[in-house]
Amino acid sequence: MKKASLIFCFFSLIGWAQSSNPASLLLDEVAAKISSYDNIKFNFSYVLENQKEQIRQETNGKVIVEKEKYVLEIPEATQLFDGQKKYTILPENEEINITDATTDDNLGIDPNKLLYFYQEGYGLQMDIVQNVQGNRIQFIKLTPQDTDQGIQYLLLGIDLSSKHIYRIIEIGENGTRTTLTLQDFSPNNLLARGTFVFDAANYPNYYINN
């Protein structure tokens, strides 16, 4: 169920100081833009590669985020966080695991932190600009200040037009490259009531591990 350590244990929001560093200023804009939305939907693709070990893993999924609440879906599982409890639903096993907010049992991705992880703990430096389907993507190189993370650096791609995150690339010290690409980013959606409510009645034959 663990998809890899990319996404990662290094997330937190809540305020950071302005800087004359252009990379910091751009990321301030990104954080302010994302924070202004009532909710966000996006799809994602995830690729983990290590050529030396001949490893390649791929998955895709979708996310809905509203403040601290989220629904994360990948092919083998769905995780719902209602602000207090996490509900991890495993259809293949007909099992549901219920844990509290502080438990580190994310499906490789923490949607609460994914959109803000860059705000603390990294040295920042502007990198290349790429043209992707007509959109200018500015990459920022993030070098961890904590050298025990097992990460050489990350590249965070920002769409300069929308100020949304487009791609996160992590280069591990063991040669592993992990790429997360956000697609179909949609803010301020009209969500159904109960989007972030777990209803056990929808899973009558499931074992619930509370």
Which stretches of residues belong to each language-model region?
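N-terminal leader/targeting segments and the immediate start of mature chains
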Residues: 15-54, 68, 205-210
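Short, exposed beta-strand/loop patches in secreted or surface proteins that constitute
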Residues: 33, 61-64, 78-79, 125-132
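A generic structural motif
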Residues: 45-51, 73, 89, 143-145, ...
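Flexible, surface-exposed loop/linker segments and immediately adjacent secondary-structure boundaries
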Residues: 101-136
